[in-house]
Amino acid sequence: MKLPAPLIEGRLVRRYKRFLADVELADGSLVTAHTPNTGSMLQCAVPGHRVLISRSDNPKRKLAYTLELIEVAGFWVDTHTHRTNRVAEEALRGGAVLEFTGWQVTPEHTYGDSRIDFLLQQNDRQALVEVKNVTLLCDGQCACFPDAVTTRGQKHLRTLMDARRAGMRAAILFVVQRGEATAFRPADTIDPEYGRLLRQAVSEGVEALAYRTRISPTQTFIDRRLPVWLD
């Protein structure tokens, strides 16, 4: 998926009120950028980190700038959670998610009282797929989710279990945005209930999938499947 162009380089000064970030540009000026991420951005929202921001000319926007990428440990990290589903959809449609090659993709499907990211269909078979954006590393090169307690994420796991019990395929797709990651596991020390529910879901037939992205200042796309560690 192509990123907005051109992107403007700067340094993160601070992230605050969840959706705001102050960025120092190369000329020393300070701008405030929208930060489309509701998580803690642990390891990413660190003052001094190099960032790339985009600028919109839309006069109706409150903030002209948007935080797009943050450099962490020499790798660009895509913290723009609104883009994650589009990257996942592109991968699902293009066959990059091997478990669902050839399935038809419909975004945003309501199941029970939850909105699930994708409904997939193949002949008379149906599958629900929920997508999660992963930007945290634990234990060296293992990607972890979540980076904060997520009751919403817990609810999604319960919904996927309900779908599986009803005879549907169900999967949670962790989109790993850390280029150095070699595996994925739940962040049990941050949200132990999420880890418990994920293991329960897998034991009931929900598929836990992890795919790593390749990110540059011009594009981001899914390119590698990672092992999921639940032990």
Swiss-Prot record:
InterPro entries named in the record: SfsA, SfsA_C, SfsA_N
Gene3D superfamilies: 2.40.50.580, 3.40.1350.60
Signal peptide range in chain numbering: none
GO molecular function: DNA binding
Taxonomy, superkingdom: Bacteria
UniProt record similarity statement: Belongs to the SfsA family.
Protein name, entry field: Sugar fermentation stimulation protein homolog
Gene: sfsA
